[in-house]
């Protein structure tokens, strides 16, 4: 088949590459992602998006591949950094209180909820091992070979939970020699050190690679003690707001810092001339970072301004136990900050993660055994950790066996374990509205088998296989929102221990085929059948850990011991036609489907709210082109898509029973207090992606991208929702663009080279909720990053000066609102110097 690569590698070399592929220009977005051998053009980028090795320009789908070299050139160190230059990709850390988790969306489709009852909407893979949770997924990008971002549903190629697309990260494999040591020093306390070393264990047979990294940065939001800074406040004088700061600067800590280290080891067994290659990897990460940066934008005093009639006004809500009003004196910056406020700082918060004595039992809990206390009686202080850390480790093994020149077998086995601790004080004040201390323990095992074949004189490429996945997640939390406004006056009622377990099993069989009808026309198709089952066990305990927690709406209706079950079988399809107009120009048309698994109610308050919801499903129609023009000085790739989104998972305003009727108030039907997810409605998503790389002269390179996502709900299945037909999805912007330019100036044979690079990226604004409340709208922003790198003549030494957010732009990544509004500010300008020694 024209322009395809071999199924396997023998002794690290590609065994079959067509001449047109070798001529296929330069790597998308600038640098080579793979340069495994001198026999391969160093500018060819090889990807495995279609489960076989291909030049990225031959893959008939919307894909961006980025090399590890380009990640370094752009000063991108974590997975969330790549969002700036990726068309139609939103990848950010979640707001404070959601741990070390990320929100990932491709083409407006994805997931941000970290609950184990909800599945990711974009699949993330590390060396082909599926990672089944958004927690702990802000991966470090040290020693990365390449990243592939596949846009659109990948149900047949990648499988479960690739509704919006897939992100695939590939680490560098051992080659037998070489390595580096690198150190970075910058403002905001940045100290980074990383190193990697390659060894030959057995000549021409066994190789090893070890990599380590540590990253340290100060937080960019400072937490202050309100009582310390405001000693004349009448609530401070009365003692209702105690001062807890121990230092004279009134600081309690930071938010948004980074403290982590990670190690990875890999072993490659590839005897020269042998049909067998085995790659074994193990990694460990310890992240002790504090919670994500967040600030109070508006309190209950101001958040209701301009809201529609009927909106619940909590502006006068107070804290009965403390007798403190929750008002704008706790706002430190912006239009709702009071003129006489002590602080005028966009990077400041009064969150103290402390409740001096408001730990309560549930309404109606009887005195004496088993709890031993009276409802409403304070039990002692509650201190939540200012944490968003994670501890994770994993092992994997990939076995490639070449059965013949035309037949190969691959086995991919992986096990991962992750523990994440998070705490929140999301009201950003010393009063007690919303606090929690949550732990997540996630374990998963996966096994995939693939059989690749090249048949009919290389005209037919065939991949068949199976996939198995087993995961268990324990969610243990202390939820503390005692005066959230849902209870009778002066009655604390919403404080309990959550100890849930979610178990998921999934297995699938798949087949993908590509047939070269002619030297230029190729037809491809695929099918995958997936069966999955999730069981979710609920446990709710009183704050002292004794006795079932009795829900606020029905004291005789506990949740403990109830199990919710979701089970579904889903079939995905793919059909593609691609045509090579010339050796350097290809057009294609594709139809594909994908799904995001269903689940059960993530946060029910009574057992009647336990109800399964089905999978989200997507049908996508895409046409595109890939070209290398002007003697390969210009690369231009583009795609246009239309997607039909079925079964959007969302929360109704009033919970429904299994008969689709609103639950009674005494049975979980409290308006505004629903912990269900339902398949609320359908939507359509349209847009495009366009990417280019231009090399007008030796050493000069320009790259750019632009994209558009138009998301619109087309039908609503249930009336008890805030969503209306025609609404956009919150958190999703429309038009996005980026551009970068660099020039490598050769200073002389014995001097080296100097490479300046500038990147500019524009992120669109979006509505923060379905109402497009102006209080939670996120404005668009444009960021500029710069880097200047000197390399020695033999490139064994390099030194770089970099500036991220060069013009110190203040912006919000996201905002969140209930009866107050908080936001996550982006990091201010950061400057650093990096020195690297290669050997």
Language-model regions, residue ranges each:
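N-terminal Sec signal peptide and the immediately downstream disordered periplasmic leader
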Residues: 1-74, 79-84, 278, 395, ...
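Acidic, small-polar-rich N-terminal luminal/periplasmic segments of exported/outer-membrane proteins
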Residues: 41-176, 623
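Outer-membrane beta-barrel domain signature, strongest for Gram-negative TonB-dependent receptors
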Residues: 247-252, 258-462, 635
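Structural signature of Gram-negative outer-membrane beta-barrels, strongest in the C-terminal barrel
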Residues: 268-270, 451-452, 461, 467-469, ...
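Gram-negative outer-membrane beta-barrel transporters
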Residues: 523, 639-644, 671-770, 836-838
């Amino acid at each position: 088949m024209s322009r395809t690569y071999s199924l396997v590698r023998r002794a690290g070399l590609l065994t079959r590459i067509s001449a047109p592929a070798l001529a296929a220009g330069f790597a998308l977005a600038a640098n080579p992602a793979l340069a495994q051998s001198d026999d391969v053009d160093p500018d060819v980028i090889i990807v495995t998006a279609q489960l076989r090795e291909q030049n990225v320009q031959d893959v008939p789908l919307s894909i961006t591949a980025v090399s590890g070299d380009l990640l370094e050139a752009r000063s991108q160190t974590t997975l969330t950094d790549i969002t700036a230059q990726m068309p139609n990709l939103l990848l950010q850390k979640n707001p404070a209180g959601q741990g070390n988790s990320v929100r990932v969306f491709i083409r407006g489709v994805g997931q941000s909820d970290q609950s184990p009852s909800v599945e990711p909407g974009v699949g993330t893979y590390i060396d082909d091992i599926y990672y089944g949770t958004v927690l702990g997924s802000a991966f470090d990008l040290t020693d990365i070979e390449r990243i592939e971002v596949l846009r659109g549903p990948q149900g047949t190629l990648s499988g479960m939970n690739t509704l919006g697309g897939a992100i695939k990260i590939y680490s560098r494999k051992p080659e037998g020699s070489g390595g580096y040591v690198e150190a970075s020093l910058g403002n905001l306390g940045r100290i980074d050190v990383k190193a990697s070393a390659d060894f030959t264990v057995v000549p021409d047979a066994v190789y090893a690679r070890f990599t380590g990294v540590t990253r340290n940065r100060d937080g960019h939001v400072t937490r202050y003690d309100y009582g310390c800074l405001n000693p004349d406040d009448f609530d401070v004088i009365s003692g209702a707001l105690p001062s807890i700061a121990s230092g004279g600067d009134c600081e309690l800590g930071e938010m948004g810092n980074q403290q982590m280290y990670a190690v990875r080891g890999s072993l490659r067994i590839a005897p020269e001339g042998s049909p067998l290659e085995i790659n074994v990897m193990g990694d460990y990460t310890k992240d002790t970072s504090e919670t994500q940066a967040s600030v109070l934008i508006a309190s209950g005093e101001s958040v209701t301004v301009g809201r529609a009639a009927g909106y619940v006004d909590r502006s006068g809500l107070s804290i009965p136990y403390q007798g403190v009003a929750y008002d704008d004196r706790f706002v430190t910056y912006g239009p709702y900050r009071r003129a006489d406020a002590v602080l005028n700082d966009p990077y400041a918060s009064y969150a103290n993660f402390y409740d001096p004595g408001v730990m309560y039992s549930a309404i109606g809990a009887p005195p004496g055994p088993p709890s031993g206390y009276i409802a409403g009686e304070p039990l002692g202080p509650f201190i939540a950790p200012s944490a968003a850390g994670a501890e994770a480790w994993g092992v994997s093994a990939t076995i490639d066996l070449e059965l013949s020149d035309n037949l190969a077998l691959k086995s991919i086995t992986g096990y991962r374990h992750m523990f994440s601790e998070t705490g929140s004080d999301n009201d950003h004040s010393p009063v007690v509205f919303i606090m929690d201390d949550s732990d997540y323990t996630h374990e998963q095992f996966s096994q995939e088998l693939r059989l690749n074949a090249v048949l009919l004189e290389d005209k037919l490429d065939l991949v068949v296989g199976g996939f198995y996945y087993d995961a268990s997640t324990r969610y243990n939390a202390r939820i503390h929102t005692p005066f959230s406004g849902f209870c009778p006056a002066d009655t604390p009622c919403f404080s309990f221990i959550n100890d849930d377990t979610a178990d998921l099993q999934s297995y699938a069989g798949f087949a993908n085929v590509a047939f070269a009808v002619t030297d230029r026309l190729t037809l491809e198709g695929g099918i995958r059948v997936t069966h999955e089952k999730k069981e979710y066990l609920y446990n709710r305990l009183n704050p002292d850990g004794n006795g079932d927690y009795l829900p606020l709406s029905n004291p005789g209706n506990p949740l403990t011991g109830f199990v919710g079950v979701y089970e579904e079988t889903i079939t995905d399809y793919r059909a593609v036609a691609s045509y090579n107009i010339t050796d350097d120009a290809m057009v294609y048309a594709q139809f594909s489907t994908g799904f995001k698994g269903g689940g059960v109610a993530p946060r029910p308050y009574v057992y009647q709210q336990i109800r399964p919801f089905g999978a989200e499903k997507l049908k996508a129609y895409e046409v595109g082109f890939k070209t290398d023009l002007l003697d390969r000085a210009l690369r231009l790739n583009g795609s246009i898509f239309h997607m039909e989104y079925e079964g959007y998972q969302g929360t109704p305003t009033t919970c429904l029973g299994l008969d689709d009727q609103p639950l009674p108030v005494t049975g979980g039907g409290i308006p505004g207090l629903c912990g269900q997810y339902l398949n609320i409605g359908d939507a359509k998503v349209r847009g495009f992606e366009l990417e280019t790389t231009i090399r007008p002269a030796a050493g000069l390179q320009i790259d750019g991208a632009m994209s558009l996502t138009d998301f619109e709900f087309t039908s609503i299945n249930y009336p008890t929702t805030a969503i209306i037909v025609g609404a956009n999805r919150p958190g999703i912007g429309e038009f996005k663009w980026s551009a970068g330019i660099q020039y490598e100036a050769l200073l002389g044979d014995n001097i080296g080279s100097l490479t300046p690079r500038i990147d500019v990226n524009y992120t669109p604004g979006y509505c923060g909720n379905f109402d497009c409340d102006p209080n939670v709208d996120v404005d668009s922003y444009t960021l500029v990053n710069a880097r200047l790198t000197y390399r020695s003549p033999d490139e064994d030494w390099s030194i770089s000066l970099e500036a991220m957010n060069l013009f110190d732009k203040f912006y919000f990544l996201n905002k969140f609102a209930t009866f107050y509004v908080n936001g996550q500010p982006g990091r201010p300008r950061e400057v650093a110097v990096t020195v690297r020694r290669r050997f």
